[in-house]
Amino acid sequence: VGKTNFISFFKLINVIYEQRLHNYTMQNPAERLFHYGLKQTKTLEGYLEFGDNAYEVVLQPRDNGSLFIGKEVSYYRGSGYPVHNIGESNIKDSVIYRDNWLRDYLQSYKIYHFHDTSVGSPLRSSANVNDNRMLSSDGGNLPAYLYALQERAPKTLKRIEAVVRMAIPYFGNFNLAPSIFDSAQINLQWQDVEYSEKYFDANDLSDGSVRFIALATLLLQPNLPKSILIDEPELGLHPAAISLLAGMMKSAADRGCQLIISTQSVGLVNHFEPHDIITVDRKEMQSTFQRLDGSALEHWLEDYSLGELWTKSIINGQPTLR
C-alpha cells in the first residue's frame, strides 16, 4: 500500500525540477495523479526539508487535465518568497542565492527501476558507447557504463564481476568492447566460466540475472549519488542473491549514500534492523508511514526474525483486507 506512490512522488519532484511537468502530465493527467481523482482532491502539495532549507510546491489542474504550479517556494530558515501560477518550475534557472543550495539537494537523488527485462527492453539492448557518465534509471546504458569502468576504474569492474559470480555461478567475466560493425554501439557480452570459446550477451541471461548485474553495478559504482531510490529490487532474485543485495546496500550506505528501497521481500527485510524499516499501511483511504521501534520489538526479536514478525502480522505493513 503506497510504497510505489512514495517512490513516484520523488519522480514527480524530479520532473518538476527538470521543467518537464507539462509533458509529464500529458501522459499522466491530473485525474490519474490526484488522490481518487479531481472530485476528491483539488490540489497536490509537496513539502521537503533539507536542514535549514525547504521546498514547497502546489500543483493545480487545468481544464484539459494537465497541471500547472499554483505555488512554488524555496525556504531558508522558515522565510521564503512564493511564486504563483507558473507553467514550469523556476528553481533550476533561479539566480537567487538560496536556490543554489536547493538545486544541490534536488539534483542529489537518483531513481532506478530495473523491472523491464523483456526481449528488446533497455536492459537487454545495445547502448551508445558514449552514454557512460552515469548509469541510467532503467539500466539502458549498462554495457556502456561497465565499459567505462573497465577503462577508467578496472578495480571496480573486477569487484562487480566477483559479486556477480557469487550470484550467477556460471558467469565468468565481461567481454566489453564496441561492436566491430558499429563502433558507436556496445553490447553486454560475457563469457561462461566453463566455456570461454563462446561469447554470450544479455539475452542469454535470466531476468533475475540481468537485474542483479544492474543492481551490482549501481551499488558498487565508484561515485555514488547522495541518495538512491529503488522500487522492489528483489524481483526475480534467488534468495542467495537477495543476501548479496543486502550486503551491497549496506556497503553503499557506509559510503555515505542514502538508500530508499520499497520491498515486499521477507528475505531482504531480514538483513536489516528495525530502525531501518518504515512500514506503509492504508488507513482512512490514505497511506500512513511509520518507522519501527526496536525497543518495542526487543522481546519478539529474541525468538523471531524481523521478516517472521512481518509475516505473522506483529508489525505493520500488512495488506488491506475488506
Where are these regions (language model features)?
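Electropositive, glycine-dotted interaction segments
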Residues: 49-176
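Short glycine-/polar-rich loops that comprise or flank the Walker A/P-loop
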Residues: 42-44, 53, 107-108, 273-276, ...
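C-terminal lobe/lid and adjacent interdomain/linker elements of RecA-like ASCE P-loop ATPase modules
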Residues: 244-322
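Conserved P-loop NTP-binding catalytic core
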Residues: 7-66
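Short, well-ordered strand-loop elements centered on a beta-strand within folded domains, enriched
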Residues: 56, 60-77, 183-192, 284-293
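Short, mixed charged/polar active-site loops
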Residues: 52-56, 197-199, 287
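Phosphate-binding glycine-rich loops of NTP-binding sites
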Residues: 1-28, 138, 207, 212-218, ...
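Conserved ABC ATPase signature
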Residues: 158-220, 227-243
